[in-house]
Every structure is written in C-alpha cells, then in structure tokens.
Amino acid sequence: MKITLKRKNIYLIVLFYSIAAILSAIYIENILGYLPCKLCLYQRIPFIFSIFFCFLGYYYFKSDKILIYLILLFSISFIIAGYHFGIENGFFEEFGGCSANNLEIISKKELLESLTINISCKDAIFKIFGVSLSGWNTFISLLIVIISLRILFYEKNK
C-alpha cells in the first residue's frame, strides 16, 4: 500500500501543526508559566506566516509559488530551531540577544529586574520524551521541507 500526500493535504497538515504549535507555546507560556527565550519567540514567526500560506495554498493549490514559500518558511524554521537545539546541547555559543535583555539599563533596580527576567537560550526548560521543543521543531520542520519538496518535484515529473 503506497501512501501519497496530495498538495491540499500537506497544506491541511501543516496548517493544523502550525496552529497546534502556536497554541501549545501560548499554553506553556501563559498557563504553565514557563517563559520563552528569544530564540523560542523567533521560532514562532514561521508558524504564524505558515498559517496564512496554508490557507492560501489550500484554495490555490495549483500554484507552485505558495508551496515554495512554505518550503522557504520551514527551511528558516529548521535553521532557527536547529541553531537553538545546538545552543541547548553545547554545539554553538549563545548570541548576544540570548544573554542580555536590554543594554540601555538606567538604574540598579532595572538591572536587577532584567537579570531575573532574562531567559537563557541554552536552558531547555520544557521537554517532551526527553527532547526539547526546539529539537522537535528541528525534526518536524525538516520533515515538512522534505515532504513538500517531494510533492513539488513528484507532481512536476508526473
């Protein structure tokens, strides 16, 4: 039995995954009380844009441009998440944005407050089955890119 994914189906799958990822991040942050680091926030951006492109792609599924945009978005997501996962596991150093919230601190009180709020990118606070959310995002983003490329090239060579 051969499983084939049609273009409309990939848009629906990615749409539901993107919505679930955003809602999960909001739940983890606001209900469970885990504060995200800057890279965690950056990883949400491709998901927000992908929701828009998935709606477009579902209705205009014959256009290659929308699928290519989706591939680019999740390639960016893969890079950001992979970099974040690398920081968490010590493969890369934290960039300046991870370690300092605000360089324009005026008073001692603001300095102390910024130290308590600052979240390090190398601390994986929330894990599922022992893998951080950035690790899962890296894997799933790469999977979406591979499946989307397969659909794009398979339909062209069909």
Residue ranges and their predicted role:
Residues K6-F16, Y60-F78, I146:
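Interfacial segments of alpha-helical transmembrane regions
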Residues G33-R44, G96-S99:
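Non-cytosolic membrane-interface motifs at loop->transmembrane helix junctions
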Residues S24-E29, I76-F91:
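C-terminal TM-helix exit segments that contain a strictly Trp-centered aromatic cap at the helix terminus
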Residues G90-S134:
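Extracytosolic (periplasmic/ER-lumenal) interhelical loops and adjacent juxtamembrane/interface segments
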Residues M1-L5:
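Short, Lys/Arg-rich, polar N-terminal cytosolic tail immediately upstream
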Residues N30-K38, G86-I87, K127:
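Membrane-interface helix caps and helix-loop-helix hairpins in membrane proteins
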Residues I117-K158:
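A hydrophobic membrane-anchoring alpha-helix module
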Residues I48-Y60, L142-F153:
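Membrane-interfacial alpha-helical segments at the cytosolic side of multi-pass membrane proteins
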